[in-house]
Amino acid sequence: MSLFDRLKNKFKKAVKTLDKSVKIEDVINQAIVSSAMKSALNLWGQMYENKAYWLHEPTLEDPSRVTSLGLPAFVASEKARTVTLEMKSEVTAPSGNDEPTTNERASFINAQYQKHVISNIRKQLEYGIAKGGLVIKPYPIIDEDITKSQFAFDYIQADGFLPIAFDSSGRMTEAAFIQRKTDTKHVYTRLEHHKLEKNTVTITNRAFKSDIGQLKNLKNFSDLGREIPLTSVPEWEDIEPLQSVENVNRLLFAYFKMPQANTIDTYSPLGVSGYSRAVDLIKDADKQYSRLLWEFEGGELAIDVDRTAMTEQPYYNEDGILKTKLAMSSLQQRLFRTTSIDQSIGDTYNVFSPALRDVSLINGLNEILKRIEDVTALSRGTISDTNLDAKTATEIIASKQRSYDDNKDIQTALQKALEDVVYIMDVYCTLYNITPQGEYAVSFDWDDSIITDKDEETSRKLLLVDKGLMTKIDFTMWYYGMTRKQATAYLQEIEAEQLQAMQINMMNDLSV
């Protein structure tokens, strides 16, 4: 073989290699999402969107109709609501006393944190509860005037990223994110890979291109296509292919994970949906609810009328052929059903009005709803009828205890994720010199008024004040939400007014 032929063959092999479609397993380590977890994630998402596999309209093969009660979305929404109902969180400069202070770094981070995170956290937490986890990824938008730089935030649901590795404490140390855009002919994929090694995070960005006909499911992350330069896609041309950030102890995104144990894959470090243990019960509830609807529909009042007793009117069909039809309005068509009746009994109609079994069906549905409340840690009466349940204040509080404990667990997990968010913002502020260096502290206030009656708690704390076990300053801070400085000034003002009133009374007594 001549030198020219050898060079020609090498060139063909090189072109073939460049044109080869790449699998994600060829680019990064295998993701740790098992097939069981993938199936569960898909099911949780379908249930949340009211697209569960057991829901269907009547067909010739199966004339029954199974409709949704909307329980998955309600469970996720209600848990997110109760977790964040009284939530307060802010970033301030650390201080040696109870008075929050500020500096330029803390003030900037807090403004972005309040605007983009706290204002959206309830909705995003709902998605995290529904699918078992949520990624919050801050990234800076650098302006030529550095003082005008801001932060943007990506919220990635549990089925939108690929976790790869965790450390022994359960903290994620490697993951990949997929971003896709399409045109009329092609699908463009950006693979963003994050990896933490020692105290350095390495972020790698690569771009791929595939024909739109070859990728039917955009959520199928396995096939990436042919690798292309990032500059081939205008939206990605400014993204750095490789970036390393040193002196960090965590990845540059926050991962919220539902705190319950994983019963789908007991060896998986991933979180599970807030209704993962109620899937079969929710299925039963939907079917029972559909039986109840069918009971009402099938038991509707109807009158069976002999055909000879009904008036017919002529009409022409689409082919111009003369036909006849019953002369009835739409309401009459719903009420009257034509049939053949033995007129020897003397009547030309029969009334169809069966007794409904609604009470037994409703009671059965209510029992299922109670079980769903139990396994999803919702307080009794959230979705069930509580007519026969707890009545006294003590019993009501006891019924809420399970929900309260679960909320506290979720709050702890959410607080950890939000602390990571602020840490990452601080890292970027230093990396890009957005603000001068400055220390910060993140505070959280989770009010427990969901389980504790405010009047009862006030009476209890006042008793502690009377017994000398709680100071007036601490009580005033709790009751009015004041700082120690504000509470001290407030009490001093009250004492001054009381002293002035006492002096006036004494002067009045002396003048008598």
Residue ranges with predicted function:
Residues 14, 18, 48, 115-120, ...:
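Short secondary-structure junctions and interdomain/linker hinges
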Residues 126-130, 135-274:
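Extended, regular secondary-structure scaffolds
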Residues 1-186:
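Extended, helix-rich architectural segments
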Residues 318-347, 352, 356-512:
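C-terminal helix-loop subdomains that flank or include functional centers
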Residues 101-105, 112-113, 117-121, 277, ...:
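Short amphipathic alpha-helical segments
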Residues 200-202, 302-304, 443:
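Ser/Thr- (and often Asn-) enriched beta-sheet segments in non-cytosolic proteins
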Residues 92-102, 215, 311-325:
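Flexible coil/linker segments and helix-coil junctions enriched in charged and small residues
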Residues 231-395:
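Extended, charged amphipathic alpha-helical segments
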